[in-house]
Amino acid sequence: MKPSLVLKMGQQLTMTPQLQQAIRLLQLSTLDLQQEIQEALESNPMLERQEDGEDFDNSDPMADNAENKPAAEVQDNSFQESTVSADNLEDGEWSERIPNELPVDTAWEDIYQTSASSLPSNDDDEWDFTTRTSAGESLQSHLLWQLNLAPMSDTDRLIAVTLIDSINGQGYLEDTLEEICAGFDPELDIELDEVEAVLHRIQQFEPAGVGARNLGECLLLQLRQLPATTPWMTEAKRLVTDFIDLLGSRDYSQLMRRMKIKEDELRQVIELVQSLNPRPGSQIESSEPEYVVPDVIVRKDSDRWLVELNQEAIPRLRVNPQYAGFVRRADTSADNTFMRNQLQEARWFIKSLQSRNETLMKVATQIVEHQRGFLDHGDEAMKPLVLHDIAEAVGMHESTISRVTTQKYMHTPRGIYELKYFFSSHVSTSEGGECSSTAIRAIIKKLVAAENQKKPLSDSKIAGLLEAQGIQVARRTVAKYRESLGIAPSSERKRLM
């Protein structure tokens, strides 16, 4: 084939750096956005914070934003949004025209409580390990701190350090004593009984139950630290030592027969065991709390739901008018070119923030419009909602809705929820309507809470009760919803009354 030159006309979509920035800011959480803003303030001298009460004579493109507009009202079938407008700082021949809109579319918890065991004492000066522990401290460091306060020989201290290294985050000894003993230098001539003796000393450390080799020993160690006058102490020790498997399987009739106690007595023994902590190490190695900052605040005024941005979450920015005034339009020096580029970047950054706020406001308002039943009555009134519904309502692509609802939170009178929480699939009803999966989960939770604990509801029975309410759900679907709620099967929910 003979080579030739051909002239064609075509269109190609190019994602500009400004568009990439707008998309990136849109998908950031509030905490990440605050960090992004701080980095922008540090790197761009043209950007600065706008303090409350300051008047910049329209020098700030964000001065006339949603903060100064009334909150969006959601009532009946109509709603109004707060709009955001921005004025350019100055119009120069060298500056690019900024568009008005940025196209951004592209099984133990059921038996035992996890709280720490309560050790009553009449001595007000008794040392309390909880007063010393701090967030982020590991269980090993806490045990080593106590080890340094205990008088021991050098050999015993070496054994103790090795044992502490073998204790996992839950407080249990992971390796057997034989394996630990075999790991020492033969020249030290350390015997198995020495290792076990040091382990018994570590088991006296706080938190109570640490260093146990199994669940029964963990509970027994905690029982031994309770006052001897504690009611049902003897029976509780026997229960965790000899019949822990029967307790786990909830074979209460077998427990009463083998322990030779009545049902009421067994219930009191189990209540004592339930006050213990099966994971003593979790008292120290608790995960750091995750903080969220709501992006949107929803409140009710009479019969109307009002939607507004959380203005305290994101600082207001403006272009520094003094630095902007130094930019000379005709000057082509390197310094002036740098300042001109920084000014343009500052304007685009502010514009991207403005676009993010507008999109977030539109989406949040539509969510509240669709889920007013939830706000008024709770989870059982949640309606089916998918991304396409909101995308169609606000005239945006589903990918944009997905970005703006990820890691964005709404503060409501019922609590703080991620925007994605309000989206759920639907299940058909016998009357031809639809019910959201969130509402079904709420109904299942309500049914289980009201069940007879001596005869808990099976998944099939729950499916039958839902069908009686006109909701057609298979037993396997009920099991899936139940597991997502952290509810154990009926065989594990059986209780002694």
UniProtKB/Swiss-Prot annotation:
One of its GO terms (biological process) is DNA-templated transcription initiation. Keywords: DNA-binding, DNA-directed RNA polymerase, Nucleotidyltransferase, Sigma factor, Transcription, Transcription regulation, Transferase. Residues 41-101 are annotated as: Disordered. This is RNA polymerase sigma-54 factor. A motif (RPON box) lies at residues 474-482. GO terms for cellular component: DNA-directed RNA polymerase complex; protein-DNA complex. It comes from Pseudomonas putida (strain ATCC 47054 / DSM 6125 / CFBP 8728 / NCIMB 11950 / KT2440). Residues 386-405 bind DNA.
